């Protein structure tokens, strides 16, 4: 069942039993050119993480299109902002990704944990002829590793207690920076190598997401 080719009434009437709940459903096919242009204008200013979060909170359809980067979400998408994966306790801090994201296609539902960083940040540093992660990107990667590990160890709790139906084996996504840093050949090649070798945690710039959004909203 694909929302882009089905009436809204039929879509919700025939909601598949294995899909997540309807409350967090977001229709990525409702993303508009106006939303895209507003988001592009924002990213062009290299905003802080908080500014990006504020925009996406009011433009969920734009963020839902991140699932298209992984060839899913065409049937339906779901967004869970600031959802606890682990509640805080006396000896441990709570674990809250910026978003839990789900996308459905003909193969089923795929899950992701998303960490946002500012478009003003870089993912990589190139000095002394070596490329390595910036402190901001490294923090984001470590956060995603924790989220994925907790998700793997607590799947039953997350599915049953906080109603993440079907939640399993999420991939991590770090959104950070723009493609300006990839103008450096070494950085571009290192980033490409990272994403090839680390399929569980992918690093993308906001420009990459913008291209995906632009392609999705083009008239067919």
Give the ranges of each region predicted by the language model.
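Charged, terminal alpha-helix-loop-beta segments
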Residues: 1-220
């Amino acid at each position: 069942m694909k929302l882009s080719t089905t009436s809204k009434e039929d879509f919700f009437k025939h909601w598949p039993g294995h899909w997540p709940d309807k409350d967090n459903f977001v229709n990525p096919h409702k993303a508009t050119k106006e939303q895209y242009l507003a988001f592009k204008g924002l990213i062009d200013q290299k905003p802080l993480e908080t500014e990006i979060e504020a925009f996406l909170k009011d433009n969920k359809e734009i963020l839902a299109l991140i699932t298209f980067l992984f060839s899913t979400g065409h049937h339906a998408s779901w967004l869970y902002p600031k959802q606890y994966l682990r509640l805080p306790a006396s000896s441990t801090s709570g674990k809250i990704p910026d978003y839990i994201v789900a996308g459905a296609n003909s193969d089923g539902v795929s899950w992701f944990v998303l960490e946002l960083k500012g478009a003003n940040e870089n993912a990589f540093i190139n000095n002394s002829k070596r490329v390595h992660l910036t402190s901001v990107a490294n923090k984001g990667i470590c956060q995603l590793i924790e989220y994925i590990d907790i998700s793997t160890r607590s799947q039953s709790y997350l599915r049953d207690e906080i109603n993440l139906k079907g939640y399993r084996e999420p991939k991590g996504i770090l959104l950070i920076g723009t493609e300006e840093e990839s103008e450096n050949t070494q950085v571009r090649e290192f980033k490409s190598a990272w994403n090839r070798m680390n399929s569980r945690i992918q690093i993308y710039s906001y420009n990459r997401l913008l291209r995906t959004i632009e392609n999705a909203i083009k008239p067919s």
